[in-house]
Swiss-Prot record, chain A:
Regions that span the bilayer: none
Subcellular location, record wording: Nucleus
Organism: Scheffersomyces stipitis (strain ATCC 58785 / CBS 6054 / NBRC 10063 / NRRL Y-11545) (Yeast)
Xref: PROSITE patterns: WD_REPEATS_2, WD_REPEATS_REGION
Upper taxonomic lineage: Eukaryota, Fungi, Dikarya, Ascomycota, Saccharomycotina
InterPro entries named in the record: WD40/YVTN_repeat-like_dom_sf (IPR015943), WD40_repeat_dom_sf (IPR036322), WD40_rpt (IPR001680), WDR18/Ipi3/RID3 (IPR045227)
Alphabetical list of Gene3D superfamilies matching this protein: YVTN repeat-like/Quinoprotein amine dehydrogenase
This protein's GO CC annotations: nuclear pre-replicative complex; rixosome complex
Family as reported in the entry's similarity comment: Belongs to the WD repeat IPI3/WDR18 family.
Main location: nucleus
Keyword Repeat: yes
Function: Component of the RIX1 complex required for processing of ITS2 sequences from 35S pre-rRNA.
Protein name: Pre-rRNA-processing protein IPI3
GO biological processes: DNA-templated DNA replication; rRNA processing
UniProtKB/Swiss-Prot annotation, chain B:
Family: Belongs to the IPI1/TEX10 family.
Keywords assigned: Nucleus, Ribosome biogenesis, rRNA processing
One GO biological process term: ribosomal large subunit assembly
MF terms (GO), sorted A to Z: chromatin binding
Region span, Disordered: 1-38
Species of provenance: Scheffersomyces stipitis (strain ATCC 58785 / CBS 6054 / NBRC 10063 / NRRL Y-11545) (Yeast)
UniProt-recorded name of the protein: Pre-rRNA-processing protein IPI1
Quaternary structure and interacting proteins, as annotated: Component of the RIX1 complex, composed of IPI1, RIX1/IPI2 and IPI3 in a 1:2:2 stoichiometry. The complex interacts (via RIX1) with MDN1 (via its hexameric AAA ATPase ring) and the pre-60S ribosome particles.
PANTHER family documented for this protein: REGULATOR OF MICROTUBULE DYNAMICS PROTEIN (PTHR16056), TESTIS-EXPRESSED PROTEIN 10 (PTHR16056:SF2)
Main function: Component of the RIX1 complex required for processing of ITS2 sequences from 35S pre-rRNA.
Compartments (UniProt record): Nucleus
Gene3D superfamilies with a match to the protein in the record: Leucine-rich Repeat Variant (1.25.10.10)
GO cellular component: cytosol; nucleoplasm; rixosome complex
Pfam families (UniProt xref): Ipi1_N (PF12333)
Length: 525, 363
């Protein structure tokens, strides 16, 4: 297995046709580069990768253009350019809950992954504050919702697909039920089905919401939302109870956030180039009680950190960036004024991501640099090829080695690779017209080395599962009868006698002791 | 007359000058002398004392200084390399993000030819580990790689000092070292001490020839090797009750809902805690046949992950114990300082045996 980091930048505004922009997928653990995508640039959060490996796709919203670029893994140039009703600023994908379970169960065991697979829904936020939702396997536009008053900065689905959360420049954050958003086919009358309210609208912030993350709990009751905003706050919400749990106040505007996979800490990227660790649990030094920090609508001011125990500094360094950037050619092309302007601009940490095991933090900044750093020692472990503009998206995904390296013979021809054109008008309400084509994957079990006994046992298992009406899977094992010859019988009888005598002895001893014990107790009393 | 002279001059132009062997050719008419003499030549890139530029902030200046010194760690003169290490030692930055650069330049010096550089480096490693807890764990992959290379180096002096670096790891990062590199370090020890894992003729004769090349200095160095081996075995074969770092949580006094809860906190000093599991390592498949008798064999050594204490003990008992004990016994017979150290190694192995017996009895 290898872990792949995908990163993309916003693109140089002077570079009209984004000739110099590129996006890369690189391994964290070795020096291998898994994939690269040319002419790729996206507004912040405006690119989404469905996964890493053969058959996965990268979907990129072109900056300031009503256009979506779709790339396939292993191919550098865009496969498709899909026109949209409006320029999008952020994107999110979600797997269908059923197929997600299916693919998780069967990823390595019985079924191959289908060679043509698309996620279930694509959601996008636009500059005018609308949220669009498409079904990817048919391309139909299921929902256009006027959710915000200003530019939507980030949309995210919860891992289970139940909720869609959107953050915006209008300082609000809205949580939607996915089922409400895609309920085009159920409603009889237009009004009720189109004018649904958000599940939760958060209006606590005073400035733009820049980023948000949801944790990935096993049960939905633990679903938590972490939002960060330019008003220096990190807020933690419980979505099911609609409660604000904790507010952390920092010293600078917050640009990005990521949460530890086990919920032990939150990492925030600030607008002065620092990354702060905010622990959610600590051991109280006075009472040595392990306690959680915050909760119960507490407001906590995060203190400055002179010992640098909770701070990552490496984005503040400018020298290494200049060494990368200021080649002689570059200096000649740009006039000096531009350079000094750049040097005085503060460095923002624009995106953060965390590795699978929660030991490495991946961070990108407004100079286009991407670092992997160790969380315990706060050291840079790896430096990636820098981009020429602010980093707009970082995603981490893991896949087996074989899947990441695209072999030439397994390439699918273009016709079978493309996703359907996304519709620009809302789909009709006639559910009978809603047709989907899905590939049913073949079984990956090797039939050759299967003998009759294995087949038989599998069939009995299947039979049991079919007949079984309760939730418990149990099978009765028959133990072969012992031929009752006298010898073994006698042996067993002897054993029994021995055991029973030992038991009675023990029993009497125990009673004796108990008596003694009660006597002692009585005496004391 | 005039015409005659002209003719003579013209003819002179076409006469080929005669060159004589052993004499330098005459300079041509248009020759310009460009030679010069100088009392000193200064190469500012290679000097330790560097003039700092004006107009940069104090912090940046320090950083430039440091990167200049780091480039000098590859200087051809061993004295300069040593001076540079001392300079870095005295100017270690408080900013943790600079340590990656420092480590990438100083780790290769484990294999440096000069003994004084290597001893300075040991001190530098110690200081780094004290200033930034967890730093050795973070870079343990490359440090261990170079140490193993040093332990099996052709140059006897580099081999002799290799265990000093190993000792730094045993002191500051015993957990990570034993979890990730127990088997490799043990194997390197066999090469270092010119012991053999198997008794077949070929390897024995090879070991004898290499041990024949061992001179007086190598014999002396064995004392140090054995002392470190003892510490290494102690660290990797016995449970570590208290961690060295004071920032580590003391489980005895923590009050929590579940007594093991503190184990799930983000560790304070162990970086890359999951690295020994080799989740993301792409290793070559093992082609040798499995002999399934519940024991480890020499052929298995390349694929074993000795992440937990029980596996390490089992590997040690199954593969290493017999040859180690045999060789230690012969060292004990030699007597002297070496014998004493070998003896103390033996007590560690005896302790292990007793503990294993106790475990077996309990079951």
């Amino acid at each position: 297995m290898d872990e792949s980091v995908f990163y993309i930048a916003e693109g140089d505004p002077n570079d009209k046709h984004s000739q110099e922009s590129f996006a890369l997928a690189t391994s964290i653990h070795n020096s291998q580069q898994h994939a690269s995508f040319r002419q790729a640039d996206a507004p912040k959060n405006g690119a989404i990768l469905s996964g890493s490996g053969q058959g996965e796709r990268l979907i990129v919203a072109a900056p300031n253009k009503a256009l979506l670029n779709v790339y396939s893994w292993g191919k550098e140039s865009p496969d498709q350019r899909i026109p949209l009703p409006e320029a999008l600023t952020c994107l999110a994908l979600v797997e269908h809950p059923n197929t997600r379970l299916f693919s998780e169960f069967h990823r390595n065991s019985e079924f191959k992954l289908p060679s043509y697979r698309v996620p279930w829904l694509l959601a996008g936020g636009s500059k005018s504050g609308k949220i669009y939702v498409w079904e990817l396997s048919s391309g139909s536009l299921l929902c256009v919702k006027e959710a915000h008053y200003q530019n939507v900065t980030v949309v995210k689905f919860s891992k289970c697909g139940t909720f869609l959360v959107a953050g915006s420049d209008d300082a609000r954050c809205t949580v939607w039920k996915t089922l409400d958003l895609i309920a085009v086919f159920d409603g009889d009358n237009d009004e009720s089905s189109r004018n649904f309210k958000p599940y939760l609208a958060i209006t606590d912030n005073t400035l733009a919401v820049t980023d948000l993350v949801l944790n990935e709990p096993g049960v939905i009751n633990d679903l938590k939302l972490y939002t960060v905003s330019r008003d220096n706050t990190l807020r933690i919400y419980d979505i099911i109870t609609k409660q604000l749990l904790t507010t952390f106040i920092l010293s600078e505007a917050i640009e990005s956030v990521v949460a530890d996979p086990a919920g032990r800490a939150v990492y925030v990227g600030l607008s002065n180039g620092l990354i702060r660790t905010i622990p959610l649990y600590n051991i109280n030094p006075n009472t040595s009680v392990l306690e959680s920090i915050g909760g119960n609508q507490k407001i906590i001011t995060v203190e400055s950190d002179p010992n640098l125990k909770f701070t990552f500094l490496h984005h503040q360094q400018r020298i290494s960036a200049d060494a990368n950037k200021t080649s002689i050619l570059h200096k000649n092309l740009n006039n000096k004024k531009n350079d000094t302007e750049n040097a005085n601009k503060p460095i923002h940490v624009t995106k953060l991501a965390i590795s699978l095991d929660g030991t490495n933090l991946i961070s990108g900044d407004s100079l286009g640099r991407v670092y992997v750093s160790d969380i315990v020692t706060r050291q840079v472990v790896k430096t990636f090829t820098p981009c020429n503009s602010p980093i707009s998206q970082i995603q981490v995904s893991s896949a087996p080695f074989e899947a990441l390296n695209v072999s030439s013979n397994s390439k699918v021809d273009k016709k079978h690779r493309l996703i359907p054109q996304l519709k620009r008008v809302l789909t009709g309400r006639d559910a009978t017209e809603h047709q989907l084509n899905l590939e049913i994957p073949s079984e990956s079990r090797d039939e050759s080395d299967e003998n009759f006994a294995v087949w038989l046992s599998r069939k009995t298992q299947e039979d049991l599962e079919f007949k079984n009406l309760s939730g418990v899977n149990s099978s009765v094992k028959k133990v072969a009868n012992i031929t009752s010859d006298s010898e073994s019988k006698k042996e067993l009888e002897d054993k029994l006698a021995k055991l029973s005598s030992a038991y009675t002895q023990l029993r009497s001893k125990h009673e004796e002791l108990l008596k003694e014990h009660s006597k002692v107790l009585n005496n004391k009393a | 007359m005039a015409t005659k002279r002209k003719k003579a001059q013209k003819a002179k132009d076409f006469v080929k000058p005669k060159l004589k062997v052993g004499k330098t050719a005459a300079k041509p008419d248009n020759h310009t002398d460009t030679s010069f003499t100088a009392k000193t030549i200064s190469l500012p890139n290679q000097s330790i004392a560097k003039k700092s530029k004006s107009g940069v902030s104090e912090e940046q200046k320090q950083e430039i200084d440091l990167s200049h010194h780091l480039s000098l760690t590859k200087h051809h003169a061993s004295a300069t390399r040593k001076e540079v290490l001392i300079y870095i030692d005295q100017h270690l930055p408080s900013n943790p993000s600079l340590y990656k650069q420092i480590f990438t330049s100083i780790i290769p010096l484990i294999l440096d030819q000069s003994a004084s550089v290597r001893t300075t480096l040991v001190a530098l490693f110690n200081k780094c580990a004290n200033m930034q807890p967890g730093i050795l764990e973070l870079h343990i992959r490359s440090i261990a790689l170079f140490i193993h290379s040093a332990m099996t180096h052709l140059h006897p002096e580099i081999r002799n000092s290799s265990t000093k670096f190993l000792n730094v790891l045993v002191e500051h990062a015993p957990q990570s070292l034993s979890k990730s590199f127990f088997v490799k370090t043990m194997r390197s020890y066999f090469t270092l001490m010119s012991w053999t894992l198997t008794d077949d003729k070929k390897s024995v004769s090879l070991a004898i020839t290499t041990s024949a090349a061992i001179g007086g200095s190598v014999k002396k160095a064995r004392i140090g090797h054995l002392a470190v081996l003892k510490a290494f075995l102690q660290a990797s074969l016995f449970p570590q009750l208290s961690d060295s770092a004071e920032s580590e949580i003391n489980p005895a006094i923590v009050v929590s809902v579940h007594p093991q809860s503190y184990k799930y906190l983000i560790p304070a000093a162990t970086s890359q805690a999951f690295a020994p599991l080799k989740l993301f390592a792409n290793e070559l498949p093992n082609n040798s046949k499995d002999i399934d008798d519940g024991k480890f064999h020499i052929s298995d050594l390349d694929t074993i992950t000795a992440e937990d204490l029980d596996t390490r003990r089992k590997v040690f008992v199954d593969v290493f114990q017999k040859p180690v004990v045999k060789n230690l016994n012969s060292l004990v017979k030699e007597g002297g300082e070496v014998g004493r150290e070998a003896n103390s190694c033996m007590t560690i192995i005896d302790n292990l045996e007793q503990e294993l017996k106790k475990v077996a009895e309990d079951e």
